[in-house]
């Protein structure tokens, strides 16, 4: 926690730095610096290069009607890039200047409605979520749906979301996320998103039986539950369950699934 005097020094240093009307690379680099290399490496967290994110967004081509989520959001690059892309489409269709991604200019209702209702992100690391929420606010969404949850361990979501501190920060976004479950599911195992763009953490195995037993990829080739499963393997199944049946998921730099499972 910064003391008032230290905070004053920080503000004095940063006050002349231009954040608005800037590109994502500059702002995101500043926030990635807040996450130490040691901390990211221990948890398998590595921020996806912005040019890779830009390529994925262009390939997936999100539109104003799409529901979008990043299930391992890190600094929320996939969702912020998607927001900027759709905003440009909206403004182009209305004959308005496309403008900058990061800007202090007021957004038109169609832009804010898209972000408020369609764009979500989840991460298990609280500090990373704070960075992602801040980036979303700087981007101009005004109200972020970035949630601090463990995507894989969804059986504990009810327990987590009942905590007062969690509710104060995330409840509004979580209520909107719950509405995207199919009518046949109420345990957070399935959702109805159009697009999932994610770069899940690769480091470490999941060893908790309560998590592994909820995934078909937690079984061995002969059908027995495994004692441990690579985290990114479980993310494959989990992300597919976030999607409607007819759409695709992008994983950048994924290892060969067969090598990981077998």
List each model region and its residues.
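Long recognition/docking surfaces used for binding and targeting
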Residues: 1-37
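Conserved phosphate/pyrophosphate-binding and hydrolysis machinery centered on Walker-type P-loop NTPases
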Residues: 20, 24, 46-50, 229
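Conserved Class I SAM-dependent methyltransferase catalytic core
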Residues: 224-262
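Proline-centered turn/helix-capping motifs that create local helix->coil transitions or kinks
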Residues: 19-23, 91, 201-210
